[in-house]
Amino acid sequence: MTLLAWCVAWILDVVIGDPPHWPHPVRWIGRLINISQCVVRRVCHSERALRIGGGVMWLVVTGLTWAVAWGVLALARGIHPWLGWLVEVWMIFTVLAGRCLAQSARDVERPLRAGDLAESRSKLSWIVGRDTTQLQPQQINRAVVETVAENTVDGIIAPLFFLLLGGAPLAMAYKAVNTLDSMVGYKHEKYRAIGMVSARLDDVANFLPARLSWLLLSLAAVLCREDGARALRTGWRDRYQHSSPNCAWPEATVAGALGIRLGGPNDYFGQRVEKPWIGDAVRDIAVDDISRTIRLMWVASSLALALFIGVRYWLVGAA
């Protein structure tokens, strides 16, 4: 039943994604983070105090998320096994973000193909932290490919990994870790202290999934008739060409698979950030690379699901 729940939840994510008006735990987690952040900022004033307060905030948000998920699942199972199964499916479904990621990328791709740079930049600003107002088509393509590659880990592989380790409650806790990082894990002055713990522990949580993405995306490249050997080589060679210990693994692998170059300088919060280049410019990046990256993402996520189902079946059987 558990393995069936995994499959059903994954299929639901592929088919319907995250309908905008449905209740979603990430929105609730986001509200909890905002409340916690306000409390911490009201109580803590020095940089050291903000770091400690940020650590307490991380413990409260992730711990409460896990506890509520575990309690709701246990209660549902106590009422009826089938209700417990449905709740488990719903929880897993909400931590997966494949279709949402693909739709967001398509929302940027469509106006870009139509030559509407203003609309494409506007849609891109919803999914990246960089300044999009002056980006040219190649820069937009690069930003979308980087986002899809990186979030293949955050949105699919890592949630499935923690699902394997600790079931739906731990996958929900991972989502809280990831949401904390996306909301407060920045290096600029406003968040540097309060978000330090969230940023570093997100790096820890994604350490193994990011490295696993190197293998999964390389195999996906072979299955998608991209250059799997170059994906494997480039993913390994450029794995540390990023300020994050994890982001370059999927980005470099995708860059190698497609024969394009990612990274480079970008503007964040009004500041120019010089990033290393990732991959080799075998050819210029093009709008078609967005669709090709989405395809790599879906195949890699399918491989991740199959791998984790196989591992769980080997460890505990079909229960």
Identify the meaning behind each predicted range.
Residues 182:
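RNA/tRNA-interacting regions in translation and RNA-turnover enzymes
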Residues 1-173, 177, 185-319:
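Hydrophobic alpha-helical transmembrane segments
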